[in-house]
């Protein structure tokens, strides 16, 4: 089975966030990064409001509007799959954007169970999320993090895996403890053996470890490694793709 490679477009600060300066600059960089991800041969990309530190658990209308505009511009420019992640945990906002731009998937950091993060308590709201998805007839798949990075978890990996299918997620994502931190191979192995749905590695993947990681999952989401000097580098994307697909 061919493995999936998803590149991350880390957006510059958006309107309403403390460090925002110029929306046109955000759009320009997002489009350039998206082009590089496509040029490098990745299967899809995901837009993430990574510059909006410190994050809100649920974002304002200005963030939804800005990300929708950016997603439209990116979708006009590239033809690979498109995903949306609204940090820190706004799945409804992500689905609203995905519906508007016909995105292929959304990422949800805490779809079920509860964790403690720097932004406060992240409460899983799978029931609300899935009902909203039905309400707006959004066809985007939902990729749910389990034991997501930058958070303290009280549920075990076993608990997450036992309850993943009840959340109606289409796939799950495992990460390391921090952005760029390598995911545990033992945790990947356990999830892959336990779950029937696709399992993705969501952090710490590089050209050197990609093949090893992909033995135990169905795809990778790569953000930190593919950047050089703050911009996505198509050659670094190619290295990941070669490692993933041979």
From Swiss-Prot:
Gene3D superfamilies: Aldolase class I (3.20.20.70)
InterPro entries reported for this sequence: Aldolase_TIM (IPR013785), BtpA (IPR005137), RibuloseP-bd_barrel (IPR011060)
Pfam entry (one): BtpA
Protein origin, superkingdom: Archaea
Transmembrane feature ranges: none
Entry similarity comment: Belongs to the BtpA family.
Name assigned to this protein: Uncharacterized protein AF_0419
Taxonomic lineage of the native organism: Archaea, Methanobacteriati, Methanobacteriota, Archaeoglobi, Archaeoglobales
């Amino acid at each position: 089975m061919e493995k999936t490679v998803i590149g991350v477009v880390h957006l510059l600060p958006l309107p309403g966030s403390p460090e925002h300066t110029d929306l046109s600059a955000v759009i320009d960089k997002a489009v350039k990064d998206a082009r590089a991800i496509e040029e490098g041969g990745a299967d899809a990309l995901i837009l993430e409001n990574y510059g909006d530190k410190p994050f809100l658990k649920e974002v304002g209308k200005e963030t939804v509007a800005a990300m929708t505009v950016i997603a439209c511009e990116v979708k006009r420019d590239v033809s690979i799959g498109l995903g949306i992640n609204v940090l820190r945990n706004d799945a409804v906002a992500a689905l609203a954007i995905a519906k508007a731009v016909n995105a292929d998937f959304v990422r949800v950091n805490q779809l079920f169970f509860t964790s403690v993060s720097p932004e406060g308590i992240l409460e899983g709201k799978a029931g609300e999320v899935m009902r909203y998805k039905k309400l707006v007839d959004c066809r985007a798949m939902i990729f749910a993090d389990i034991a997501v990075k930058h958070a303290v978890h009280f549920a075990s990996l076993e608990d997450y895996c036992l309850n993943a299918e009840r959340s109606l997620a289409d796939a799950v994502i495992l990460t390391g403890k921090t952005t760029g931190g390598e995911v545990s191979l033992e945790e990947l192995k356990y999830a892959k053996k336990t779950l029937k749905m696709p399992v993705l590695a969501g952090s710490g993947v590089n050209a050197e470890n990609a093949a090893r990681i992909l033995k135990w999952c169905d795809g990778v989401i790569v953000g930190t490694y593919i950047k050089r000097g703050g911009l996505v580098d198509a050659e670094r994307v190619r290295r990941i793709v070669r490692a993933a697909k041979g």
